[in-house]
Amino acid sequence: MSENQDTQKSFLETVKFDDRGLVPAIVQDHETGKVLMMAWMNLESLKMTLEKKKACYWSRSRNKLWLKGESSGNMQDVHDIMIDCDGDTLLLKVSQKGGACHVGYHSCFYRKTTDGEQMEICDTLMFDPEEVYGKKS
Amino acid sequence: MSENQDTQKSFLETVKFDDRGLVPAIVQDHETGKVLMMAWMNLESLKMTLEKKKACYWSRSRNKLWLKGESSGNMQDVHDIMIDCDGDTLLLKVSQKGGACHVGYHSCFYRKTTDGEQMEICDTLMFDPEEVYGKKS
């Protein structure tokens, strides 16, 4: 077993950030196991998540730290953080307040396909994005 | 709701591959909800997955198509494929034969930290990698 696959190194030393300094974080409801979203973290947002126990990401579109729920109020309380064998993907077990998805659904994975062509909605709408984020001008 | 967030376009048209032509795929046990791994797909591996209903990825380390389980026998039968709001992450619901992780665990996420420093093993060893893949020379 290589050094990156065991538990000898510290957690932060084990995380492998990519060439942009980011690592993907899968977010899962800690009680139901439902996968809610995937987002990206840099070292700063990971440290903030560990410190505050609230999920904090790096927004690639806005190029800034993103405390999940800072606009919508839909914060994520972090219960556990897991890391994969290669150290290059994280899994957060959270309690999600409201919906995780900016479109208004509970999960960002609100569409599924079985035939590879058609898609259908497979999740519950939790809020109206225009009410939460304001109307787009 | 933008075009990329609804169900009007076809599934394959909705998938947004990154600048390497890849999209991350989260893999979840379809019965227990346990997150097993994350891997990457290109268009070819996604089409093969849809066609065969067996998970097929793009191996970034070997730079080739990777039918999951082709070496270990630990195939993944694909029940559903979901796509997130931005179209840039997939979620596969699968039946996993044996362990998903090449280290021998059921899930690649076999280590967790709660304090951000120490890590502990939180999963079950399913097989001995040396027996399955052969000894490393």
From Swiss-Prot, chains A, B:
Protein name according to UniProt: Phosphoribosyl-AMP cyclohydrolase
UniProt entry keywords in alphabetical sequence: Amino-acid biosynthesis, Cytoplasm, Histidine biosynthesis, Hydrolase, Magnesium, Metal-binding, Zinc
Cofactor binding: number and manner: Binds 1 Mg(2+) ion per subunit.
| Annotated catalysed reactions | 1-(5-phospho-beta-D-ribosyl)-5'-AMP + H2O = 1-(5-phospho-beta-D-ribosyl)-5-[(5-phospho-beta-D-ribosylamino)methylideneamino]imidazole-4-carboxamide
Q: Which residues bind Zn(2+)?
A: C85, C101, C108
Q: Does the keyword Amino-acid biosynthesis apply?
A: yes
Gene3D superfamilies for the chain: Phosphoribosyl-AMP cyclohydrolase
Gene Ontology cellular component terms for the protein in this record: cytoplasm
Instruction: Report if keyword Hydrolase is assigned.
Output: yes
Q: In which pathway does it act?
A: Amino-acid biosynthesis; L-histidine biosynthesis; L-histidine from 5-phospho-alpha-D-ribose 1-diphosphate: step 3/9
Q: Name one GO molecular function term.
A: magnesium ion binding
Tell me the GO BP annotations in alphabetical order.
Answer: L-histidine biosynthetic process
Instruction: Identify the NCBIfam families for this entry.
Output: PRK00051.1
Which PANTHER family does the entry mention? HISTIDINE BIOSYNTHESIS BIFUNCTIONAL PROTEIN, HISTIDINE BIOSYNTHESIS BIFUNCTIONAL PROTEIN HIS7
Q: Which Pfam families match?
A: PRA-CH
Question: Which E.C. number(s) belong to this protein?
Answer: 3.5.4.19
What cofactors does this protein use?
Mg(2+); Zn(2+)
Q: Which family does it belong to?
A: Belongs to the PRA-CH family.
Functional note: Catalyzes the hydrolysis of the adenine ring of phosphoribosyl-AMP.
Query: Gene encoding it?
Result: hisI
Q: Which residues bind Mg(2+)?
A: D84, D86, D88
